[in-house]
Curated annotation (Swiss-Prot):
Signal peptide: none annotated. This is Microtubule-associated protein VP6. It is found in: Virion; Host cytoplasm, Host cytoskeleton. Keywords: Capsid protein, Host cytoplasm, Host cytoskeleton, Inner capsid protein, Virion. Interacts with VP2. The keyword Transit peptide does not apply. One of its GO terms (cellular component) is host cytoskeleton. Its main location: virion. Minor inner capsid component. Displays NTPase and RNA 5'-triphosphatase (RTPase) activities. May function as a cofactor of polymerase VP2. Associates with microtubules and plays a role in the formation, structural organization and morphology of viral inclusions, where the assembly of cores and the replication of viral RNA occur. The keyword Endoplasmic reticulum does not apply. It comes from Lymantria dispar cypovirus 1 (isolate Rao) (LdCPV-1).
Length: 561
């Protein structure tokens, strides 16, 4: 019994590449033989489980969504029978009916509680009225279970996937505590097709590639038991017409799985775009569609990935679309709630990310899309905004904090104060080239980073007008600063100074930031040194989000203008 009814939610299972075998839906179709070793321990028609889902939903609806004594229901379904207790005085005809349905009936005194319903169960040993189940519910459930002839019960099947588990009905969640569910592993939303339950209930995918493209007869395939995963790079319609796959179901995956060359070996990346919209083919360079990859991609390998500006596509395969995590959507929804609320003076989102992650490029676009969706101006300050402003104003007695002026300083051709100080520190230690820096011992690097850290901290909260705390306060409260503001950060101590907000996230992107710094044309050794310094100080306790999750949160929000 799947935790989510496949008959009523077939579209959900199709997202996992799962299509029910025909005989599970229509009993008039003779089931195709499956090897005994491939069978699951207990196989029953999917219709039985669908009837149980309907019965459980009906019983829960009688009590505002709550199952009375979920343990009894769990035992009845997964064990095939249960022991129930009825109060003395229960009509003999009712007791006989329960016994006929395979229940062991034990009589118990009412203890002078005349209003108590007819029966309860031995799942509890006291007279807790919260656990008492009516005779009507017991009869309905036991009659249904008995009709299936299930002496061993049904196994509850759950996918190890966040989206799947978030959609499990409440009445099933109430049962799970009292069962030992069979967990089907998933990888990035793709179910483990070797699982015996999946093989018994669903068509098993067969992967067609350019190297094995041939007729189904050559592969000994049947449309009753197999679906087709088209990884040939050719359109489904062409494969069906030319190779005789007209009767087969082709799995529809709208995302991509791209394999790249990398400094340390092949790199796998999932992208929430179909290949036709992405515009990449084997041999294409990483930078060709960089923004699309940055906005919709996630690296699946351990960091550092080794992807760089020189990386090229090895192959592109169809893949299931990624779903935003519940944690990411929750924290982003909190920010969007502030954006639309008339009771919030300023809505500020603080975003930390590694230096070189591409956060400024992405967040500029995010701010534009949020502005269009919300119908209001959205401001954006890069993580270098303060350092660049300070470089121009450190000797100015009364500097301007006007938002537009700060933006005019916040450009790539303006050297940051921290870049200046990092360059001075590297020169002091005799470092002028990337190779020299990378050959330093760990102890030497850490010593230099600690010195740079002191420079960063010195500017945070000093009493000077030019301190970082004063800068962010003056800019964020300025009369020309947009009410909704996105502010980038570099390191953990900025939590205390960067902006007044209760919404802070840690952005993960596709970039290998070390490689990104090496690829930069301007002051590569300075950029890499700053990246390493900031990385050690990156706040890791904030909720991690990916660019595609931030964009998806805007799409899912119910905007009212």
């Amino acid at each position: 019994m799947f935790a989510i009814d496949p008959l009523k939610h077939s579209k959900l299972y199709e997202e996992y590449g799962l299509y029910l075998r025909p005989h599970q839906i229509n009993q008039e179709i003779k089931p195709t033989t499956i090897k005994k070793k491939e069978l699951a321990p207990t196989i029953r028609s999917i219709r039985y489980a669908s009837l149980l889902h309907s019965m459980l939903a009906k019983h829960a609806a009688r009590h505002n969504g709550t199952l009375i004594n979920p343990r009894m229901y769990a035992d009845m379904i997964t064990l095939g029978n249960t022991k129930v207790t009825v109060t003395k005085g229960t009509p003999k005809a009712q007791i006989d009916t329960l016994k006929m349905n395979g229940l062991t009936v034990v009589s118990k005194s009412r203890r002078n509680n005349k209003k108590k319903p007819v029966s309860d169960t031995t799942a509890t040993t006291d007279e807790n009225t919260n656990d008492i189940v009516t005779y009507k519910a017991l009869t309905e459930m036991s009659t249904l279970v008995e009709s299936f002839h299930l002496p061993s019960g049904l196994t509850l099947i759950v996918f190890d996937d966040e989206k799947y588990q978030s959609l499990i009905p409440d009445y099933i969640n109430q049962l799970i505590t009292y069962t030992q569910p069979h967990i089907i592993p998933t990888w990035q939303g793709i179910a483990d097709f070797s699982d015996p339950y999946l093989r018994s209930y669903f068509r098993r995918p067969f992967e067609l590639t350019a190297s094995n493209l041939a007729s189904p007869q050559k592969h000994n395939l049947s449309p009753l038991t197999r679906s087709i995963f088209n990884n040939t790079g050719r359109e489904d319609a062409i494969i069906k017409k030319l190779y005789g796959y007209g009767e087969y179901i082709f799995i529809k995956y709208e995302g991509c799985l791209i394999t790249w060359t990398g400094v340390y070996g092949a790199v796998a990346m999932m992208v929430n775009l179909p290949k036709r919209d992405l515009g990449l083919d084997a041999g294409d360079n990483f930078l060709k569609e960089y923004k699309q990859l940055l906005f919709y991609g996630v690296i699946t390998d351990a960091t550092p990935s080794g992807i760089s500006a020189k990386s090229t596509v090895i192959k592109i395969s169809p893949h299931k679309m990624m779903n935003p995590s519940g944690g990411a959507l929750a924290v982003l929804s909190k920010f969007l709630e502030a954006v639309v609320s008339a009771n919030v003076i300023n809505a500020t989102l603080v975003v930390y990310a590694e230096k070189g992650a591409g956060k400024t490029s992405f967040l500029s676009t995010y701010a534009e899309r949020l502005s269009v969706a919300s119908g209001q101006a959205v401001g954006h300050l890069s993580s270098d905004a303060y350092g660049r402003w300070l470089a121009k104003n450190k000797d100015v007695k009364e500097p301007s904090f006007e938002y537009d002026y700060v933006l005019s300083r916040d450009t790539d051709d303006t050297e940051s104060y921290y870049e200046q100080r990092a360059s001075e520190l590297l020169t002091l230690h005799g470092i002028s080239e990337l190779a020299q820096y990378e050959l330093l011992s760990v102890r030497k690097k850490v010593k230099m980073m600690n010195e740079m850290n002191e420079i960063l901290i010195a500017q945070l909260e000093n009493a000077d007008t030019h301190s970082e705390r004063n800068f962010y306060y003056m800019v964020s409260t300025g009369k020309n600063t947009p009410r909704t503001l996105i502010v980038e950060g570099h390191f953990n101590a900025q939590d205390a100074t960067i902006a007044r907000t209760d919404t802070t996230v840690l952005l993960r992107t596709i970039n290998d930031t070390t490689q990104a710094m090496r690829d930069r044309q301007r002051s590569g050794v300075v950029q890499l040194f700053l990246r390493d310094t900031y990385y050690r100080l990156l706040p890791s306790l904030h909720t991690t989000v990916y660019p595609f999750e931030m964009l998806e949160s805007i799409k899912r929000w119910k905007w009212v203008h």
